[in-house]
Amino acid sequence: MDIEIEKIIRTKRKTIALYITDGATLIIKAPFNANDKTIMGVVLKHKKWIEQKKIEIGERDPKFSPKEFVNGEGLLHLGRYYRLKIVGDQEVPLKFENEFYLSRNALPQAKEVFIEWYKKIAYDKISERVRRYAQKRGFKYNMVKITNAQKRWGSSSNGNLNFPWRLIMAPLPVIDYVVIHELVHLEEKNHTKAFWDRVKMLMPNYEKYKGWLKKNSYLLRL
Protein backbone atom coordinates (compact mmCIF):
# COMPACT_ATOMS: atom_id res chain seq x y z
CA MET A 1 0.00 0.00 0.00
CA ASP A 2 1.33 3.46 -0.93
CA ILE A 3 1.28 5.86 1.99
CA GLU A 4 -0.34 9.17 1.17
CA ILE A 5 0.60 12.16 3.31
CA GLU A 6 -2.22 14.65 3.73
CA LYS A 7 -0.12 17.45 5.22
CA ILE A 8 3.33 18.20 6.63
CA ILE A 9 3.37 20.86 9.34
CA ARG A 10 6.73 22.50 10.03
CA THR A 11 7.31 23.66 13.60
CA LYS A 12 10.10 24.38 16.07
CA ARG A 13 9.81 20.86 17.43
CA LYS A 14 12.92 18.65 17.47
CA THR A 15 11.36 15.34 16.44
CA ILE A 16 9.05 14.02 13.72
CA ALA A 17 5.56 12.99 14.85
CA LEU A 18 2.87 11.09 12.92
CA TYR A 19 -0.86 11.58 13.45
CA ILE A 20 -3.80 9.70 11.93
CA THR A 21 -6.90 11.91 11.83
CA ASP A 22 -10.51 10.83 12.38
CA GLY A 23 -10.77 10.86 8.61
CA ALA A 24 -7.95 8.27 8.39
CA THR A 25 -5.50 10.71 6.79
CA LEU A 26 -1.83 11.06 7.76
CA ILE A 27 -0.58 14.35 9.20
CA ILE A 28 3.11 14.86 9.94
CA LYS A 29 4.65 17.42 12.27
CA ALA A 30 8.34 17.91 11.58
CA PRO A 31 11.20 20.30 12.47
CA PHE A 32 11.92 23.11 10.01
CA ASN A 33 15.26 21.51 9.11
CA ALA A 34 13.92 17.98 8.42
CA ASN A 35 14.20 17.15 4.72
CA ASP A 36 11.72 15.03 2.74
CA LYS A 37 14.03 12.01 2.72
CA THR A 38 14.26 12.01 6.51
CA ILE A 39 10.50 12.39 6.87
CA MET A 40 9.79 9.54 4.45
CA GLY A 41 12.26 7.37 6.34
CA VAL A 42 10.20 7.82 9.50
CA VAL A 43 6.97 7.18 7.60
CA LEU A 44 8.26 3.94 6.09
CA LYS A 45 9.59 2.80 9.45
CA HIS A 46 6.07 3.10 10.87
CA LYS A 47 4.25 1.83 7.77
CA LYS A 48 2.55 -1.11 9.52
CA TRP A 49 1.35 1.11 12.36
CA ILE A 50 -0.05 3.66 9.87
CA GLU A 51 -1.90 1.00 7.88
CA GLN A 52 -3.30 -0.61 11.04
CA LYS A 53 -4.58 2.73 12.35
CA LYS A 54 -6.18 3.62 9.02
CA ILE A 55 -8.01 0.30 8.92
CA GLU A 56 -9.19 0.68 12.53
CA ILE A 57 -10.53 4.17 11.91
CA GLY A 58 -12.18 3.14 8.67
CA GLU A 59 -13.98 0.26 10.40
CA ARG A 60 -14.98 2.39 13.41
CA ASP A 61 -17.87 4.00 11.57
CA PRO A 62 -21.05 2.20 12.76
CA LYS A 63 -22.56 2.78 9.32
CA PHE A 64 -19.91 0.75 7.53
CA SER A 65 -21.32 -1.86 5.18
CA PRO A 66 -20.80 -5.63 5.45
CA LYS A 67 -17.50 -7.08 4.32
CA GLU A 68 -16.94 -7.21 0.58
CA PHE A 69 -14.04 -9.69 0.72
CA VAL A 70 -11.78 -7.74 -1.60
CA ASN A 71 -8.00 -7.36 -1.67
CA GLY A 72 -6.71 -5.17 1.14
CA GLU A 73 -9.85 -5.34 3.26
CA GLY A 74 -9.24 -5.59 6.99
CA LEU A 75 -10.71 -8.43 9.05
CA LEU A 76 -10.49 -8.80 12.80
CA HIS A 77 -8.79 -11.59 14.70
CA LEU A 78 -8.06 -11.32 18.44
CA GLY A 79 -8.53 -7.57 18.39
CA ARG A 80 -6.29 -6.78 15.42
CA TYR A 81 -7.10 -6.11 11.80
CA TYR A 82 -5.35 -8.27 9.22
CA ARG A 83 -5.45 -7.67 5.50
CA LEU A 84 -7.16 -9.98 3.07
CA LYS A 85 -5.36 -11.19 -0.03
CA ILE A 86 -7.16 -13.01 -2.82
CA VAL A 87 -4.88 -15.72 -4.21
CA GLY A 88 -4.95 -18.53 -6.74
CA ASP A 89 -5.53 -22.15 -5.91
CA GLN A 90 -4.32 -23.35 -2.51
CA GLU A 91 -4.88 -26.57 -0.59
CA VAL A 92 -7.49 -24.97 1.69
CA PRO A 93 -9.98 -22.17 0.91
CA LEU A 94 -8.61 -19.89 3.64
CA LYS A 95 -5.19 -19.55 5.25
CA PHE A 96 -4.04 -17.23 8.00
CA GLU A 97 -0.35 -16.36 8.16
CA ASN A 98 -0.28 -12.85 9.61
CA GLU A 99 -2.64 -12.02 6.73
CA PHE A 100 -5.73 -13.76 5.41
CA TYR A 101 -5.26 -15.63 2.14
CA LEU A 102 -8.54 -16.52 0.44
CA SER A 103 -8.62 -18.75 -2.62
CA ARG A 104 -10.23 -17.05 -5.62
CA ASN A 105 -12.37 -20.17 -6.11
CA ALA A 106 -13.85 -19.65 -2.64
CA LEU A 107 -14.94 -16.05 -3.26
CA PRO A 108 -18.62 -16.92 -3.92
CA GLN A 109 -18.77 -18.50 -0.45
CA ALA A 110 -16.30 -16.13 1.22
CA LYS A 111 -18.52 -15.24 4.18
CA GLU A 112 -19.32 -18.88 4.93
CA VAL A 113 -15.65 -19.82 4.60
CA PHE A 114 -14.64 -17.14 7.09
CA ILE A 115 -17.37 -18.13 9.54
CA GLU A 116 -16.20 -21.75 9.50
CA TRP A 117 -12.61 -20.61 10.07
CA TYR A 118 -13.64 -18.32 12.92
CA LYS A 119 -15.68 -21.13 14.51
CA LYS A 120 -12.73 -23.50 14.57
CA ILE A 121 -10.31 -20.91 15.93
CA ALA A 122 -12.91 -19.73 18.45
CA TYR A 123 -13.46 -23.25 19.76
CA ASP A 124 -9.74 -23.90 20.20
CA LYS A 125 -8.91 -20.56 21.82
CA ILE A 126 -12.01 -20.14 23.99
CA SER A 127 -11.86 -23.76 25.19
CA GLU A 128 -8.27 -23.17 26.26
CA ARG A 129 -9.24 -20.01 28.19
CA VAL A 130 -12.18 -21.77 29.85
CA ARG A 131 -9.92 -24.63 30.98
CA ARG A 132 -7.36 -22.18 32.31
CA TYR A 133 -9.78 -20.22 34.50
CA ALA A 134 -11.85 -23.25 35.51
CA GLN A 135 -8.77 -25.10 36.77
CA LYS A 136 -7.46 -21.99 38.46
CA ARG A 137 -10.63 -21.43 40.50
CA GLY A 138 -12.22 -24.87 40.61
CA PHE A 139 -15.23 -24.25 38.36
CA LYS A 140 -16.97 -27.37 37.05
CA TYR A 141 -18.46 -27.36 33.54
CA ASN A 142 -19.48 -29.90 30.91
CA MET A 143 -18.49 -28.59 27.51
CA VAL A 144 -17.86 -25.48 25.42
CA LYS A 145 -20.06 -24.79 22.42
CA ILE A 146 -19.56 -22.21 19.66
CA THR A 147 -22.80 -20.70 18.38
CA ASN A 148 -24.15 -18.28 15.79
CA ALA A 149 -25.65 -16.01 18.45
CA GLN A 150 -25.97 -12.40 17.33
CA LYS A 151 -26.95 -10.58 20.52
CA ARG A 152 -25.45 -12.54 23.41
CA TRP A 153 -21.74 -12.84 24.11
CA GLY A 154 -22.14 -15.89 26.27
CA SER A 155 -24.63 -18.12 28.04
CA SER A 156 -24.61 -21.17 30.26
CA SER A 157 -27.10 -23.98 30.75
CA ASN A 158 -26.83 -27.40 32.37
CA GLY A 159 -23.12 -26.86 32.86
CA ASN A 160 -22.52 -26.08 29.19
CA LEU A 161 -20.88 -22.79 28.18
CA ASN A 162 -21.94 -21.18 24.92
CA PHE A 163 -20.04 -18.47 23.06
CA PRO A 164 -20.61 -16.91 19.61
CA TRP A 165 -17.89 -17.35 17.00
CA ARG A 166 -17.76 -13.56 16.66
CA LEU A 167 -16.10 -13.34 20.07
CA ILE A 168 -12.79 -14.53 18.58
CA MET A 169 -12.60 -11.18 16.79
CA ALA A 170 -12.21 -9.39 20.14
CA PRO A 171 -8.94 -8.80 22.02
CA LEU A 172 -7.91 -11.68 24.29
CA PRO A 173 -8.60 -9.80 27.57
CA VAL A 174 -12.17 -9.17 26.36
CA ILE A 175 -12.56 -12.89 25.62
CA ASP A 176 -11.24 -13.65 29.10
CA TYR A 177 -13.81 -11.28 30.62
CA VAL A 178 -16.67 -13.08 28.84
CA VAL A 179 -15.27 -16.48 29.84
CA ILE A 180 -14.99 -15.44 33.49
CA HIS A 181 -18.48 -13.94 33.34
CA GLU A 182 -19.98 -17.25 32.18
CA LEU A 183 -17.95 -19.38 34.58
CA VAL A 184 -19.20 -17.31 37.51
CA HIS A 185 -22.75 -17.75 36.20
CA LEU A 186 -22.38 -21.49 36.78
CA GLU A 187 -22.51 -20.72 40.50
CA GLU A 188 -24.17 -17.29 40.62
CA LYS A 189 -27.18 -17.30 38.28
CA ASN A 190 -28.12 -13.62 38.56
CA HIS A 191 -26.21 -10.36 38.24
CA THR A 192 -26.20 -9.71 41.97
CA LYS A 193 -23.54 -7.88 43.93
CA ALA A 194 -22.10 -11.27 44.85
CA PHE A 195 -21.84 -12.13 41.15
CA TRP A 196 -19.93 -8.97 40.24
CA ASP A 197 -17.72 -9.30 43.33
CA ARG A 198 -16.63 -12.74 42.13
CA VAL A 199 -15.99 -11.47 38.61
CA LYS A 200 -13.89 -8.65 40.06
CA MET A 201 -11.94 -11.07 42.22
CA LEU A 202 -10.95 -13.01 39.10
CA MET A 203 -10.43 -9.93 36.92
CA PRO A 204 -10.00 -6.72 38.95
CA ASN A 205 -10.20 -4.48 35.85
CA TYR A 206 -13.13 -6.31 34.24
CA GLU A 207 -15.07 -3.05 33.79
CA LYS A 208 -12.51 -1.91 31.21
CA TYR A 209 -13.21 -4.94 29.02
CA LYS A 210 -16.93 -4.90 29.68
CA GLY A 211 -16.89 -1.30 28.45
CA TRP A 212 -14.81 -2.21 25.39
CA LEU A 213 -17.36 -4.83 24.39
CA LYS A 214 -20.26 -2.44 24.83
CA LYS A 215 -18.54 0.26 22.79
CA ASN A 216 -17.09 -1.91 20.02
CA SER A 217 -19.46 -4.86 19.66
CA TYR A 218 -20.71 -3.57 16.30
CA LEU A 219 -17.24 -4.21 14.86
CA LEU A 220 -17.38 -7.93 15.60
CA ARG A 221 -19.24 -9.03 12.49
CA LEU A 222 -18.69 -9.79 8.83
List each model region and its residues.
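Active-site-proximal or metal-binding-adjacent scaffold patches in catalytic folds
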Residues: 1-177, 186-222
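Walker B catalytic acidic pair
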Residues: 182
